[in-house]
Amino acid sequence: MASVQRKSWCALTIRLLGRTEIRRLAKELEFRPRKSLGQNFVHDANTVRRVVSTSGVSRSDHVLEVGPGLGPLTLALLDRGAHVTAVEIDPVLAERLPHTVAEHSHSEIQRLTVLNRDVLTLRRDELAEPPTAVVANLPYNVAVPALLHLLAEFPSIRTVTVMVQAEVAERLAAEPGGKEYGVPSVKVRFFGRVRRCGMVSPTVFWPIPRVYSGLVRIDRYPTSPWPTDPAFRRQVFELVDIAFGQRRKTCRNAFVDWAGSGNESADRLLAASIDPARRGETLSIDDFVRLLQRSADRGGTDREGTSPPTAGQGAPAR
């Protein structure tokens, strides 16, 4: 692990925040990290370089950073020439961030926007320009909801590079049938491909968390294989929730209420080339999408009484 952290990832010209300076800033602000907000700040320059290098952001990118905290990752992103919109829920940290950037490189401040907001309520009309990338050290307690919200709300986002709790990283990248495979694994693949990019030691954070972190990158599909409108996505996600709410049941039994009867459930599954005896935890995102679309072909309806769209009939992406 240590050898990974020492690797040189990319050259930065801005002086980054180290552990001593982060502690000094916290003391200056009379600030104590709150566990309820998942506030753990990365202070290791090599880790910051690694995250930025993995993201691949450049001058052409508008980066959405979630939970910038005291600004170590923000500085590195600005150093790459990107425009950065930093979304920080803590008002004290949000107010201090522009001053920190100005102190380290005054010329970069023009490319920084800070929003004192909860990322889960962020809407696209609040940003002057659509973001092309997300790069963040995500608070553990909101990692999955934040990822799904941002991918749905901002279709302009092409890549997501985040540090999350190692367990969350494993779940996001898990394959069908594995013990870590679950709702997050499937839903994030509705939007794009997921890959793990290594582990991150707890010692690079202040305060030191009790668990390892994982670095994850998500690349949105260049062209979505299925409709991306909110109604279609909601129906697919409903099937995912049903399947994993009863993950040890066979698919036939898990989808009885949704289909209306056991026989209809089996027929819809067979129409989608899914063995009714399979368990929900073995289904891929392709399986869930196909199940919904084949149900529509058979005349199945959603709870509002309208047939789910088949491929190519989706509304503009949200």
UniProtKB/Swiss-Prot annotation:
This is Ribosomal RNA small subunit methyltransferase A. It comes from the Bacteria. It comes from Mycolicibacterium paratuberculosis (strain ATCC BAA-968 / K-10) (Mycobacterium paratuberculosis). Belongs to the class I-like SAM-binding methyltransferase superfamily. rRNA adenine N(6)-methyltransferase family. RsmA subfamily. Residues 295-305 have a biased composition (Basic and acidic residues). Keywords: Cytoplasm, Methyltransferase, RNA-binding, rRNA processing, S-adenosyl-L-methionine, Transferase. The keyword rRNA processing applies. SUPFAM superfamilies: S-adenosyl-L-methionine-dependent methyltransferases. It catalyses: adenosine(1518)/adenosine(1519) in 16S rRNA + 4 S-adenosyl-L-methionine = N(6)-dimethyladenosine(1518)/N(6)-dimethyladenosine(1519) in 16S rRNA + 4 S-adenosyl-L-homocysteine + 4 H(+). Its EC number is 2.1.1.182. Its main location: cytoplasm. The keyword Transferase applies. Residues 295-318 are annotated as: Disordered.
